[in-house]
Amino acid sequence: NNVKLYFMLGLPTETDEDVLGIAELVYKVILAWKENAVNKKRGLRVHVATAYFVPKPFTPFQWEQQITPQEYLRRCKLLKEHFYSKSIEYDYHSPDLSCLEAVFARGDRRLGPVIEAAVKSGARLDGWDEYFNYSKWYDAFRACNVEESFYTTRGYGEEEILPWDTIDIGVGKKFFLRERKRAYEGLVTPD
């Protein structure tokens, strides 16, 4: 009688209609449960969680920008407004933590001094929400004159040399560019 659903917000080409499609799917799950549950007296709890898209190296979306934290929160609010059933719980990832993840996923050597400054200011175990203190990272970025948006909300050009281009994973840029094009066209790549 418990269902957990996990979605990602902020993917390239995502629209408000896509976000509302999540709510529609959740209500279809509830309806399917009502139509098929053996013991309806126990009720249904649907836990919905959304993550904030982080463009990662060696993926077709490595060139994409991350939506702003404000836009992510707007989409979270839009979704939450459409969850009117008491059986739905909704949580979303911290935009600050996801932005920091994007910075370090796409970062370069300029981030070394930022990490050092953050650690010296007491940043520890920052992958855990209960320990994460964005202000320490914010101060470290400012002290090192590094702008986070250079790594997050800026898209990369297809011809741009990326910090991870020196690493050979056995799959070239051409493959990722082809997959990116297929994604934008809504095509599935067969196995």
Regions picked out by a protein language model, each given a short descriptive name:
Residues 3-12, 59-65, 158-162, 185:
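Glycine- and acidic
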Residues 63-75, 82, 186, 190-191:
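Short secondary-structure subsegments characteristic of cysteine-rich extracellular domains
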